[in-house]
Amino acid sequence: MTAIIDIIGREILDSRGNPTVEVDVVLEDGALGRAAVPSGASTGAHEAVELRDGDKARYLGKGVTKAVGAVNGEIFEALSGLDVEQQAQIDQIMIDLDGTPNKSRLGANAILGVSLACAKAAANSLDMPLYRYVGGTSARLLPVPMMNIINGGVHADNPIDFQEFMILPVGASSFAEGLRYGAEVFHTLKSELKKAGHNTNVGDEGGFAPNLPSADAALEFVMNAIGKAGFKAGSDIVIGLDCASTEFFKDGKYVYEGEGKTRSISEQAKYLADLVARYPIVTIEDGMSEDDMDGWKELTDLIGKKCQLVGDDLFVTNVKRLAEGIKAGRANSILIKVNQIGTLTETLAAVEMAHKAGYTSVMSHRSGETEDSTIADLAVATNCGQIKTGSLARSDRTAKYNQLLRIEQQLGKQALYGGKAALKALA
C-alpha cells in the first residue's frame, strides 16, 4: 500500500523570484507528499551542489529543468515500486545513483525534493503529522525562534558587515508567547527606525536593512526596541548574531568594509568576545570563516563556555566535517540546513552526532525560501530546541512559525518550549 507509484518534479519560484524544485510523491494508496526545496545566498564552499541549468536565455541561467528532469526520469525509475517508509534505503539509492561526493550530477535540489516528499507521503499515508512520523513519540519540544530583525551583509544593501541580528525570546513560557514577544519587538523596532529617519523596507528574510555604520549601532537599536516593547534584555529576550564572516575574510584578515576596519584572526575573536561582554549575546553563528580553523579554535577557547558558537559554513550539515570539528574543539553548535547535505537521512544523522557530542543544533531555513514548512516539523521531530527561520514578516518565513503554532496546539499539555534550557550558555 505504501509503494511509490509516481514522482512528479516541477520548477516553481522561491521567495526571491528564482526557480527551485518542487516534488510530489504519490503512493499506491493515493497518499501524496509534496516538498519544495530552498536556496541560499551566502553558501558554504563545502555544501552539496544545487544544480542550475546555466542557460542565460532562461531565468538568467538559474533554471532548474535539469534537476526536474532527473526527478522525473532517473530518480523515479530507481525508486518506483519501493516502500516509501524505507527512508534510509531511498536516500542511499539516490546518493549511489548520483555517484558524486557532493550530489553534483543529479543535483542536491533534485535529491532533497524527493527525499522530503517521500517522508511527507509516508506520514500522510499513516495519517500522522510529519514531526511524529520522523521523531516518534518523544518529539514534543517546541524550538526557541531566532528571529532575524536587522539584516546586513549579502542579505542587504547597507554598510553593516554582519549578516543577521536576531532576538531569541527565551523567557517566554510557550512558543506562541515567544512569537508574540518577537512580533512586538519587531513592530517597536520598525517605529524606532522610522523615527530616526531610517528606511523600513524588509530584506530577503523579512528583517529591516537600515543604513547603519556598524554592528554596535545595530545592537543599540535592538536593545532599545526590546526595552521599549516592555521586555527585559538578557532575561525575557537575548540576542544572536550571524556574522557570515566567510563573506568578508580576505587574505587571512577580516575586512570590515562598512566600518572601514581590518581585523586579524586574533582581533576578530577578541572583537566578538568584547561584543558578548557588552550585550546579552548568547549565540554567534559563523563568527570565523569556514576555512579559518585556527580562528575557530581560538574563538571557541575564548568564549565557548559562555556563548553558543554555531558552525554553518564551517560544518555545512555534513557529518564528516562535524566529526572533525568535534574532535578539534571547534564551535559548540551546528546549524542544520537540509539543502546543504541533500537528504533527510543525512540531516538526521548530523543532528544525532551533534547531540551525542554535547553540541546543540539549530534547524534553519535559507534566504531563498518557499511556503513549504517542513523544517518546522523537523525542528520538533529532532527536539533540537532552536529554529532559525527569519523575521516576523513575509509569508515564506511566517509559514514556518504558523506551522509551529499548529504543532504546539496539537501537542497540548505534552508540548514543551525550549526556553533558556535550549541554549547551554543560559542553562
From Swiss-Prot:
Cofactor(s) needed by this chain: Mg(2+)
Manner of cofactor binding, per the entry note: Binds a second Mg(2+) ion via substrate during catalysis.
Binding site for (2R)-2-phosphoglycerate: Q163, K337, R366, S367, K388
CC terms in the record's Gene Ontology section: cell surface; extracellular region; phosphopyruvate hydratase complex
GO molecular function, a single term: phosphopyruvate hydratase activity
Reactions that this protein is recorded to catalyse: (2R)-2-phosphoglycerate = phosphoenolpyruvate + H2O
Protein name: Enolase
Organism: Bradyrhizobium diazoefficiens (strain JCM 10833 / BCRC 13528 / IAM 13628 / NBRC 14792 / USDA 110)
